[in-house]
């Protein structure tokens, strides 16, 4: 309530994550310096869990998307069919996408599996730029790579996934 007092991190409503606090801190510094502050959108902050089997998500869940009025299709691919996961012996888990049926916009993404907290960045980029499932399915990923599982999940939207 005071113009000259700012709060970030665990003091504010939202995700209590280091990368969220850092983004808010940069926003505050830019505001104080009279620069155009970076936009910090809560829905574009990744949620990451650093456990043996990592988990990460960004955006809306299926339930949240439906509650917001979207007609959604949920796709999923498993790491069991991913060459890199098989080579590394880390083939547990999946990638799940929540997609708006009408426009193909990627509304949310959920990953449980190897390096999920690294992979989520690509899905954040697509979501934050309002990318479509069609664009995501057209990306030619390196092979072998865990990122190929993203393409598989995108291809599942069109019933054209081949490694499932």
Q: For each predicted feature, which ranges?
A:
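FAD-site-proximal beta/loop scaffold in flavoenzymes
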Residues: 1-34
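Active-site-proximal substrate-binding core of FAD-dependent oxidoreductases
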Residues: 31-58, 142
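Internal, well-ordered alpha-helical scaffold/interface segments
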Residues: 23-26, 30, 47, 60-67
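Short acidic-hydrophobic sequence patches enriched in Asp/Glu that either
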Residues: 20-24, 41, 115, 128
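Flexible, glycine-rich terminal cap/loop adjacent to redox cofactors
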Residues: 50-164
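Short amphipathic alpha-helical segments at helix-loop
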Residues: 9-13, 46, 138
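Short, flexible turn/loop "capping" segments at secondary-structure junctions
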Residues: 2, 41-43, 101-102
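A generic structural signal for well-ordered coil/turn residues at beta-strand boundaries
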Residues: 1, 45, 91-93
């Amino acid at each position: 309530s005071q113009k000259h007092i700012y709060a970030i991190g665990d003091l504010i409503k939202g995700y209590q994550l280091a990368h969220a606090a850092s983004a808010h801190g940069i926003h505050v510094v830019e505001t104080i310096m009279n620069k155009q502050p970076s936009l910090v959108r809560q829905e574009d902050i990744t949620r990451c869990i650093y456990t043996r089997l990592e988990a990460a998500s960004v955006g809306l869940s299926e339930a949240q998307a439906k509650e917001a009025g979207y007609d959604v299709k949920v796709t999923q691919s498993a790491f069991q069919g991913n060459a890199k996961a098989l080579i590394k012996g880390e083939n547990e888990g999946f990638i799940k996408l929540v997609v708006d049926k009408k426009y193909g916009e990627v509304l949310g993404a959920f990953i449980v599996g190897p390096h999920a907290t690294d992979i989520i960045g690509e899905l954040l980029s697509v979501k934050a730029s309002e990318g479509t499932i069609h664009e995501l399915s057209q990306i030619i990923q390196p092979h072998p790579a865990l990122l190929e599982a993203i393409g598989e999940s995108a291809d599942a939207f069109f019933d054209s996934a081949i490694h499932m």
